[in-house]
């Protein structure tokens, strides 16, 4: 027995001498470094760097690992023209790149976690890359070159939508967005608003500086608090009066503010209809 034990100890000693580091303590290879992030536009890279805390004040290269954890980026008025590279920010929830020179939104296509997107004052025409960003709740696209908004039809979580100062004529793509509470379409080329009464959750609706004459599609919007219709082609306020009369429970009429300056209202609208609306609690600003 002692001979066997001694033999075993000798074998163990030889193994230790040959391989002094136990297998369970063997060194592992370090993880491969994260690929360097690449931006086509140095102005965009500078904006992103400000939100990478460890590298905001240095010149170490940004890596893809740095980008994947970013939730917010803001780069207002920096002369940004190209968004390439931003597609690596897969967990981005809020992005504000207003007042730049952006045209192409394709790098945003896969950023499906964005909830707040501000791109006002750019040169954007094509909204199709936004069609699958279903998490969007706030979208600001005022003062661009947008003509068609069909791509927004699928953004069913949108609560606030700003599209003023564009070239929009057809609003049919947004009249069935179930969560929409604020809609701004000032300074466009809108002549008709069919289906707008489908947006039953609207609190604020702004159509200033368009070419709207018929207000009958507004009937059926019980939650409106602010209705802006300045500088259109409205002559008759009958539909508004009917809306207020039907509000027997006084749920919205006493809280409704209507802005009508700059419309060719008839004498009847200015006197009888104004008076009737005011008696029902509607505040007229003309």
Which residues are covered by each model-predicted region?
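Canonical leucine-rich repeat
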Residues: 83-86, 105-108, 127-130, 149-152, ...
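N-terminal capping/linker segments that flank leucine-rich repeat
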Residues: 3-9, 13-94, 107, 112, ...
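A generic tandem-repeat structural signature
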Residues: 98-99, 103-147, 155, 160-165
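Conserved hydrophobic beta-strand positions in leucine-rich repeat
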Residues: 71-73, 95-97, 117-119, 139-141, ...
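Leucine-rich repeat
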Residues: 67, 88-92, 108-114, 130-136, ...
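Short hydrophobic transmembrane-like helices used for membrane targeting/insertion
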Residues: 2, 10-14, 18, 102, ...
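Eukaryotic tandem repeat interaction scaffolds
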Residues: 159-220
